[in-house]
């Protein structure tokens, strides 16, 4: 069994940020990754850019290069993560799958495909979007069209000349709608159950994220009342295009359920030009038909389900009573640990309006400070 000062599970932005922040205190972390560095980013769709601005999206101790531009591409994010590992000399063990985690005296034993690791501190950073979530729609097994999850979408090439239904109103679903139209899909519909909040990614040179940072310091009650006005000021009232203003209380729902606003990269224009049609929520499938909540039926050639992801933490820590039963999120996060699991940290499982990369940077520093304060070096 290999003894380590700290074991970090996951070599995505959150795991690497924590390992990099620990370097500031002279602590080396062993990062275990079942795939490759930044694996989830490598799998994203081709046109993806960060919806948060470069200068607010770096990890601890290493800025993103200016040559990446304001909105960093998928490939540049992957390059940045690889360079981050080199810059901080982080020990990343790729191809190592974690199979279990258990208490071992005052520390933890991490069981993996390559043997066991022991450490007094373990940081879990397996990712916000680990497993694709597909609703259990009635009749789904009868659908004769093509259906895929947005996590499998790479580009619009397979959909040129086709009628496509995109289900869901997250940032991925919104950008996929734009990509489909710009690349030659015949007709694009967007299925909406709960109208999203839509904000601008860029406000005449001011990134929308900067407002998100400000919003986090405002009273929640005030933000609940202001949220509809904020959208109306940013993009106008989209009700006539099928997206009514968010109701009062939408900001609280965002905080409670991690329902992120759409940071617009072209959807608003597509809606106003009637190039993307908003339709009701999907209720069920019947052969070639998709039956919607308003009773209407449509027959798209393909359905892309932008229906989100789950954290997938249950196999790893489900027996420790650390996971919210419905949402699957850890009940503690950041530098806070649970009495049932001292020395076990979670990072990267929130998606704040101020930006995930920025949040990761802040939380990683807090975790590193906590570990350094309580550190008992391994022999």
Listing of model-derived features with the role each one plays in the protein:
Residues 2-11, 16-42, 69-171, 175-205, ...:
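Flavin (primarily FAD) cofactor-binding/catalytic cores of flavoenzymes
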Residues 36-61:
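Redox-cofactor-proximal catalytic regions of oxidoreductases
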Residues 56-63, 244-249:
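Short, basic/glycine-rich phosphate-binding loops at helix/coil junctions
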Residues 63-69:
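A short acidic, helix-capping loop that chelates divalent metal ions and anchors anionic groups
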